[in-house]
Amino acid sequence: MFDISREQQNMLEKNKDCVITFETNRERITIENTNIKDILSDRRIHIFALCITSDNIPIIGIRRTSFMYQSVISKRRSFSEILAVDINHLKYMYNNEIKEICIRSIVPFTYSGFNNFEELVLLGGRVKNKESIYQCLSRELSEESDGILTIKTFGNKILKLTIEDKILRRTFYGYCIVCFIDQLYSEIIKPLYNIEIKELGSLFDRSSNEKYEYLHFIYNTLLTYKYGGVL
């Protein structure tokens, strides 16, 4: 994974036009400074939050369904249709998803590469008509946490994220802001039942995840480097 240096971190802090790029086996991510005016000119805004608990733990969502499996299933024209899946892509799926893929293969097989894969995501989503970005985040955070999270305040600096999924050949655009919540970390560690997020967790506990380095960079940039000034 791309190794970000303190010099590059400072470069993004000081230079509005600077773009920092990370690359993993699966994704290419660019991160750059932006502002509210830039967001308002975007007609299809997706806004996300790097949430910080009241005891200063950055939290992320663990998605219920992997993007890889969702992509495979979305191409299925009937429930019984068998689809080709690259075995190298199974490592980006959950064990129960891999099991279903194995059962539905032309020649049923056993996959021995089971691991502790987690699909990490920032909380948030698309801004609806007549919503502000803050109203959108308030709604999304409530929905994705089963009503657990309540917002204390937002930061006033925003990053623009461009995420290219090299396997799925799709590119996602969004904006990220820091969000301080009222809850302690211990208050949010419980199973969730909404359709998108199965649990919330500490970013610090996911250092072995492919996405960790760029998510940690976002955390450092928005918080440690004073991009997270409170509104």
UniProtKB/Swiss-Prot annotation:
Its cofactor is Mg(2+); Mn(2+). The keyword Cell membrane does not apply. Residues 74-217 form the Nudix hydrolase domain. It is an enzyme of class 3 (hydrolase). One of its GO terms (molecular function) is hydrolase activity. Decapping enzyme required for the removal of the 5'-end m7GpppN cap tethered to viral and host mRNAs to allow their decay in cells. May therefore accelerate viral and cellular mRNA turnover to eliminate competing host mRNAs and allow stage-specific synthesis of viral proteins. Acceleration of the turnover of cellular transcripts may even promote the shutoff of host protein synthesis. Does not cleave unmethylated RNAs or RNAs shorter than 24 nucleotides. This is Putative Nudix hydrolase FPV054. It comes from Fowlpox virus (strain NVSL) (FPV). The lineage of its organism: Viruses, Varidnaviria, Bamfordvirae, Nucleocytoviricota, Pokkesviricetes.
